[in-house]
Regions:
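Short coil/turn connectors at secondary-structure junctions
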Residues: 12, 37, 66-68, 172-175
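Boundary/entry segment of secreted carbohydrate-active catalytic domains
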Residues: 12-24
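Phosphate/pyrophosphate-binding betaalpha-module
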Residues: 162, 166-181, 189-192
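N-terminal glycine-rich anion-binding loops that anchor highly charged ligand groups
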Residues: 24-41
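Enzymes and membrane/adaptor proteins characterized by extended Gly/Ser/Thr/Asp/Glu-rich
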Residues: 36-158, 181, 186-200
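Single conserved hydrophobic/aromatic residue that forms the stacking wall/gate
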Residues: 1-11
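A general structural detector for well-ordered alpha-helical segments in enzyme core domains, enriched
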Residues: 27-31, 56-60, 119, 162, ...
């Protein structure tokens, strides 16, 4: 709406946007060339096959004339996975890794290292260079389950520690990260995708 009111210059390159399908439409190409977003985020609706996704990410970089264009994805594992067509990591929720960290830190480090390496390899293969992890929301009782098993723990020290490890491991595997959620889903009583949460 702001862009259509002539404020495009102010917001140019200050935003991330998504696209509609498996390939770019003429309208989307025109929009991207005009407003030059900072990055593009992909969702399940954009991913069909490995080759198709590779062509899509290559097209985005070519159109925006940026070989290092930030191309983002939500690949948390568990119920938030955009790459289900290629991998099944439904078991590997953040809660799974948080519980494992509490029980056996050595096993956690081994499992988490292998997990991050596999996800990073697939992302690089697809031409994706940013994963929107880690989720740093603290799990709280009797609130909306938009977070739930997406949180590492109800213990803020564990969330912080695993968050640091997650960032470090992805960076070592050449994938940038974006922490979330800000200001935080942990205290939300409603799903912010559907309603506006009010946090006291």
């Amino acid at each position: 709406r702001l862009l259509s009111r002539g404020l495009g210059d102010v917001y140019k390159r200050q935003f991330i946007c998504g696209i509609k399908g498996y390939k770019l439409s003429k309208t989307e190409i025109k929009f991207l060339r005009k407003y030059k977003p900072w990055g593009i985020i992909l969702f399940s609706r954009n991913i069909k096959t490995i080759k198709q996704t590779q062509l899509l990410t290559k097209s985005l970089k070519n159109i925006l004339q940026n070989p290092t264009l930030p191309i983002l994805i939500d690949e948390e594992g568990g119920r938030v996975s955009r790459l289900r067509k290629f991998i099944d990591n439904s078991v590997f929720t953040n809660k799974y890794f948080g519980d494992l960290y509490k029980k056996d830190k050595k096993k956690f480090n081994l499992y988490f290292d292998v997990y991050v390496k596999q996800i990073s390899y697939l992302l690089r293969l697809l031409g994706i260079n940013v994963n929107t992890v880690p989720v740093l929301d603290i799990l709280r009782k009797n609130l909306h389950q938009i977070v739930g098993d997406r949180s590492f723990s109800s213990n803020k020290k564990i969330v912080s520690k695993i968050g640091d490890i997650c960032i470090d491991k992805f960076h070592k595997n050449k994938i940038a990260t974006i922490t979330k959620h800000i200001p935080g889903h942990g205290l939300a009583k409603v799903d912010s995708h559907l309603k506006l949460p009010i946090i006291d």
